[in-house]
């Protein structure tokens, strides 16, 4: 009887470990989510250029039916390695790392009062430095952008 309980407990532990491993394998890491939400390199061509933000936010599952519209989102049109390189830069007083050079990006800002889809955005093309927070040497959050010093 005791052996049966030990075997059952061992089997349950193995199943729990297997499920945890599978969940991690199919789950999205914070870095993967950062890439999905913020990196568009090379810049995606959209037939209606003025609809770039709506198209990309829906395609990248940032906005979706039943979820509130995201007030702002930025797509960086540079290789992911350039944003990873920012993590090796000295952090600022707030703990954010900045890209050493300005890069092309599209800043999307929600227009009107819609808080639920359909979401309508204003797009601005900019050349800005990008501020990120990093974990394990990888960017996981886009904290903001700023214009190069003149």
Q: What is the predicted function of each stretch?
A:
Residues 2-99, 110:
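N-terminal "domain-start" segment
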Residues 94-127:
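Acidic, glycine-rich flexible loop segments
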Residues 114-150:
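Compact beta-sheet-dominated globular domain cores
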């Amino acid at each position: 009887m005791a052996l049966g309980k030990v075997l059952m407990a061992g089997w349950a532990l193995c199943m729990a470990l297997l499920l945890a491993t599978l969940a991690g394998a199919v789950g999205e890491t914070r870095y993967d989510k950062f890439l999905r939400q913020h990196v568009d390199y090379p810049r995606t061509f959209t037939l209606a250029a003025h609809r770039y933000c709506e198209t990309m936010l829906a395609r990248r599952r940032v906005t979706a039916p039943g979820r509130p519209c995201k007030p702002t989102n930025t797509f960086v049109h540079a290789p992911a390695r350039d944003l990873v390189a920012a993590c090796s830069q000295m952090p600022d007083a707030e703990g954010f790392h900045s890209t050493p050079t300005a890069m092309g990006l599209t800043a999307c800002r929600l227009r009107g009062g819609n808080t639920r889809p359909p979401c309508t955005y204003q797009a601005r093309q900019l050349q800005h430095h990008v501020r990120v927070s990093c974990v394990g040497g990888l960017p996981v959050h886009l904290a903001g952008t700023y214009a190069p010093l003149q």
